[in-house]
């Protein structure tokens, strides 16, 4: 999939919608290829201005979508046109997980604390009982050399990384080449 991208602040943002993310997921899983997806919101824009490591990490992510209404306003003010439709992942996460369930894809959750992860997974299982959750890891004190091995052995198709910015983007950019998954997606704090 080729998506138009626009330069806004110190990074590029792809003009993608939820339907593009689902199409990209289907494509990469069917072709057994890998893709990374992240987002840019006003908080990340502020961080980029003083964090070159984050800027470099964002440049390594295949697709960055605009997150939140603030990015739409910024594009209108700075670029003088409605260039971006924001894709707020919290509006689509349940729909995406149901999409994964329907296709029998396996998902791995990386991020947050053990307590929050267990509560999140229990809630997801109560609403989407047939979703194949292939594993989870604490994103704060369980990240070590074995983490990649655990994720890879889970046979997950999709990895959701919810560690907040800039940690999740930097972790993804440093580890994407070692991951045996099809879709790696930064989803914010869990």
What are these model-derived regions, one by one?
Residues 37-39, 65, 158-162, 185:
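Structural motif
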Residues 41-45, 163-168, 190:
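Short glycine-rich anion-binding loops that position phosphate/pyrophosphate groups of nucleotides
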Residues 62, 107, 134, 157, ...:
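Conserved acidic residues
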Residues 71-150, 154:
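Conserved beta-alpha
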Residues 121, 169-178:
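Short Gly/Thr/Asp-enriched flexible loops that form oxyanion-binding sites at enzyme active sites
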Residues 139-143, 181-190:
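Short, flexible loop segments at boundaries between secondary-structure elements
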Residues 151, 155-165, 181:
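Proline-aspartate-enriched helix->loop->beta-strand connector
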């Amino acid at each position: 999939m080729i998506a138009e991208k626009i330069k806004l602040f110190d990074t590029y943002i792809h003009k993608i919608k939820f339907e593009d993310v689902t199409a990209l997921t289907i494509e990469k899983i069917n072709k057994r290829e890998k893709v990374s997806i992240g987002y840019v919101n006003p908080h990340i824009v502020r961080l980029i201005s003083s964090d070159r490591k984050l800027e470099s990490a964002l440049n390594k992510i295949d697709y960055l979508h605009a997150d939140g209404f603030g990015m739409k306003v910024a594009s209108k003010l700075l670029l003088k046109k409605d260039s971006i439709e924001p894709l707020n992942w919290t509006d689509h996460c349940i729909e995406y997980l149901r999409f994964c369930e329907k296709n029998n894809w396996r998902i791995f959750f990386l991020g947050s604390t053990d307590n929050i992860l267990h509560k999140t997974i229990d809630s997801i299982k109560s609403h989407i009982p047939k979703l194949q959750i292939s594993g989870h890891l604490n994103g704060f004190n369980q990240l070590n050399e074995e983490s990649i091995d655990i994720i890879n052995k889970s046979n997950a198709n999709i990895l959701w990384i919810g560690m907040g910015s800039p940690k999740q983007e930097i972790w993804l950019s440093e580890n994407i080449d070692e991951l045996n998954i099809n879709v790696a997606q930064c989803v914010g704090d869990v």
